[in-house]
A protein has these predicted regions:
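Core helices of alpha-solenoid repeat scaffolds
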Residues: 457-458, 489, 522-526, 559
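Gly/Ser/Thr/Pro-enriched helix-cap/hinge segments flanking short amphipathic alpha-helices
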Residues: 354, 358, 408-413, 417
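Alpha-solenoid HEAT/Armadillo-like helical repeat scaffolds in large eukaryotic proteins
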Residues: 406-411, 431-437, 448, 460-468, ...
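Beta-propeller domains with acidic blade repeats across secreted/periplasmic ectodomains
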Residues: 19-403
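Bacterial N-terminal signal peptides
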Residues: 5-15
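Structural detector for internal amphipathic alpha-helices that build alpha-solenoid repeat scaffolds
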Residues: 392-402, 413-426, 440-455, 459-463, ...
C-alpha cells in the first residue's frame, strides 16, 4: 500500500584526484559544429586530452561538471587505459572558458556506463551502467565520491544480455524526487530487474521499458512499454515525461515520445528487428498503442527539458534538435528545429545545463562503436528559447482516470491506457464485447479484457478470433501469441489453415509457432511461411497467403519451387 501511495502521488503531482596537462587552446574552425538557429553559438570546452569517448554528463549542486569516460564500450585489445569506466570532474581553473584540468570523481568496476544524473533534492549522484544503477555522494564537496557512501545495485538488471547500450540508461527524477529510467530491448534476452527491498520483475522479448521507483530503488514498477531503446528520458515540471527511442530499424524515423503511464508504444523485440511484423506498431497503428510525439534524427541519445522545449542529441545525424511543446488538452504537438549541425566528426551524446545558461554537450566524435581515443565536450550558448508555458499537473488527470461515457476516450489513442484500465473487470464478460457494435470500441474492450485477465481464464481471446473485424482478429492473435496461450492452439491452427487474409495468416502462423515454443523473429517466421508454401497438400488459399507475405522469396524459394507453383495450374497462385 505504501508503494502505491508513493507511485500515485507521483502521478498526481573513491579515487584520488589527479591534475592533467592543459588542453589545447585552438580549435580548427572547419571542424567545429555549425550553429543553425539564430543567436546560438558553440565552442569546444574540452578535447580528447581531457575526455575520451564521453557518454553521460551532469552538473552537481556545487556546480561541478561530471563527465563519464567509457573505457569498456567495445574495448579493442590494444586500447590503453584503465579497465573500468571513469567519471571525471572537468574544470576550467583559470576562467577563460576552456577546460584545462580533470580529476577522477569515481572509478570502480563501471562497465558500459551510459548516464549520470544528480538528484534534485539530495544532490546524490546516480550512475547508470548497462546492468546497474549506483548512488554516489560527495558530502564534503571535495570532488571525489565518498568511499563510505557508495551504494551499488540500487537497481540491478540480471540477464545474460551484454550488448553495451541497450540496458539501463535515461536517468531522471519526478517532482517528488522518485527515480525514472529506461531499459532497452536487451536483444530479447530473458531478464529479471531487481529493485530495492528485493522487488523483482521478470520478462523477455517485449522490447524496451520505462521504469519508476522510489529514490532508493524500492517500489519498482513498469511505467510504460513498447520502446526499442528509451536511451534518453526526461521529466518536465507537472509530471510530464518524455523519451527518445534509439533505433527505428527499418521503419524510420527514430521516435520522440510523450510517455503516458501504462502506455504501449508498440514495439516488441520477439517479433523481429525489422519492425515490419503486423503485431508491431510504430506510430499507434494498432488500437491501444501510442503514437510518437515526433520523429527525430537518427540514433537519438540524451534528451533535456528547458522552458517548455525538448532538446535531443542525434548521434548519427550529428546535430542538436529542439522541439517546442504545445499542449492540446490530452497531449502535446511539436515541430523540429535544428540548433546545431555538425560536420565530419561530431557525435553528440548527452547534455548538462548549468546555472549560468550554458549547455554542455558530450561528443563521442567518431562513428566507431569501438573505443578510439577521441572525445570532446562542447559549450553551447544562446540555446534556451523564451519560456513556453506548460500545463499544470491537473491537466494529466484525464490521462490517468477515464470517463468511458465521453467519446474522446474511444477516439484519442493517448487516452487508451486510462480507458483500458477503467473498463477493467467489466470486460471479462464476453457478452459486453459482443454487444459493442463499433469495431474500434470492441477492440478496446478486448484489450481491457486482456489487461484484466492476461492469462485469459475466460477464453475471451478465442471470441476475438471469431470476430468479423480483421483488426480484432489480429489483436486476439497477438494476445494469444504474447502470452503463448496453449488453450487457444486449435483455434489458431484453424485460422492458419483457412486464413481470412494474408496478413492474418502471418499473424496466425506466428502465434502458432509461439504456442509451440518456437522463435518467431524475422527470418524464423519467414522460414515457417516458406515451408507452408511448399506443402503440396496445403490449400490454394494458404499457399496464396504464404506467397504474398513471404518477404525474401529469393532466399526461401528455388527455381524448382517456382516452377512447381506455376505448373500446378493453381489460379489463386
Amino acid at each position: 500500500m505504501k508503494s502505491e501511495i508513493f507511485f500515485f502521488s507521483f502521478l498526481l503531482s573513491g579515487s584520488i584526484a589527479t591534475a592533467q596537462d592543459p588542453a589545447p587552446r585552438s580549435v580548427p574552425v572547419e571542424l567545429a559544429p555549425i550553429p543553425v538557429a539564430e543567436g546560438v553559438s558553440i565552442q569546444r570546452f574540452a578535447d580528447s586530452s581531457l575526455i575520451k569517448q564521453p557518454t553521460g554528463l551532469a552538473i552537481t549542486h556545487a556546480g561541478k561538471l561530471l563527465a563519464v569516460q567509457s573505457n569498456t564500450h567495445f574495448r579493442p585489445d590494444d586500447y590503453e587505459g584503465v579497465e573500468t569506466d571513469q567519471i571525471f570532474w572537468i574544470q576550467d581553473t583559470d576562467g577563460d572558458g576552456i577546460a584545462d584540468q580533470k580529476s577522477v570523481f569515481y572509478q570502480n568496476e563501471l562497465v558500459a556506463t551510459m548516464d549520470i544524473a544528480v538528484h534534485p533534492e539530495s544532490g546524490a549522484i546516480y550512475v547508470a551502467t548497462r546492468n546497474e544503477i549506483i548512488r554516489l555522494w560527495d558530502d564534503n564537496n571535495d570532488g571525489v565520491a565518498d568511499p563510505d557512501r557508495v551504494e551499488r545495485r540500487l537497481v540491478f538488471l540480471e540477464t545474460e544480455g551484454n550488448y553495451p547500450h541497450n540496458g539501463i540508461s535515461g536517468l531522471t527524477f519526478d517532482d517528488l524526487g522518485n527515480l525514472i529510467f529506461g531499459v532497452g530491448e536487451n536483444l530479447g534476452a530473458p531478464y529479471t530487474i531487481i529493485g530495492g527491498r528485493k522487488t523483482k520483475i521478470s520478462d523477455q522479448g517485449e522490447g524496451g521499458n520505462i521504469w519508476w521507483a522510489q529514490a532508493d530503488g524500492s517500489s519498482l514498477q513498469r511505467f510504460a512499454t513498447g520502446f526499442w531503446n528509451p536511451f534518453g528520458v526526461v521529466h518536465a515540471p507537472g509530471g510530464f515525461i518524455f523519451a527518445t527511442d534509439n533505433d527505428p530499424s527499418s521503419r524510420p524515423p527514430s521516435r520522440l515520445h510523450f510517455v503516458i503511464y501504462g502506455g504501449d508504444y508498440g514495439y516488441q523485440y520477439r517479433y523481429g528487428r525489422s519492425g515490419q511484423h503486423p503485431f508491431i506498431a510504430w506510430d499507434g497503428e494498432l488500437p491501444g498503442t501510442m503514437p510518437m510525439l515526433h520523429g527525430t534524427g537518427e540514433a537519438p541519445c540524451d534528451i533535456l527539458y528547458a522552458n517548455g522545449a525538448l532538446y535531443v542529441a542525434s548521434w548519427a545525424d550529428r546535430r542538436i534538435e529542439r522541439y517546442h511543446l504545445q499542449w492540446d488538452g490530452f497531449g502535446f504537438s511539436t515541430k523540429q528545429e535544428i540548433l546545431v549541425r555538425g560536420e565530419g566528426n561530431f557525435r553528440p551524446v548527452a547534455f548538462a545545463a548549468s546555472d549560468d545558461g550554458s549547455l554542455y554537450c558530450s561528443d563521442w566524435v567518431k562513428s566507431d562503436y569501438q573505443l578510439h581515443g577521441e572525445g570532446a565536450i562542447w559549450k553551447v550558448t544562446g540555446w534556451a528559447s523564451n519560456l513556453y508555458p506548460m500545463p499544470e499537473a491537473e491537466a494529466r488527470i484525464p490521462l490517468m482516470k477515464a470517463d468511458p461515457t465521453q467519446d474522446i476516450y474511444w477516439t484519442d489513442p493517448r487516452l487508451s491506457p486510462a480507458l483500458i484500465r477503467e473498463l477493467g473487470e467489466a470486460d471479462r464478460d464476453a457478452a459486453a464485447i459482443r454487444a459493442e457494435s463499433d469495431p474500434h470500441r470492441r477492440a478496446l474492450r478486448l484489450l481491457a479484457a486482456r489487461n484484466a485477465d492476461p492469462e485469459d481464464l475466460e477464453g475471451i481471446s478465442t471470441i476475438g478470433l471469431a470476430d468479423s473485424d480483421p483488426t480484432i482478429q489480429l489483436l486476439a492473435l497477438k494476445w494469444i501469441s504474447d502470452l503463448q496461450l496453449q488453450e487457444s492452439r486449435d483455434a489458431v491452427e484453424a485460422m492458419v489453415n483457412n486464413p481470412p487474409t494474408p496478413k492474418l495468416f502471418l499473424a496466425a502462423i506466428t502465434a502458432l509457432a509461439r504456442i509451440d515454443g518456437k522463435e518467431v523473429a524475422d527470418k524464423r517466421v519467414q522460414k515457417l511461411i516458406g515451408e507452408r508454401l511448399r506443402q503440396s497438400d496445403a490449400s490454394s488459399k494458404v499457399r496464396a497467403a504464404a506467397f504474398e507475405v513471404l518477404a525474401d522469396r529469393e532466399n526461401f524459394l528455388s527455381i524448382d519451387d517456382l516452377r512447381q507453383i506455376y505448373e500446378s495450374g493453381d489460379t489463386d497462385l
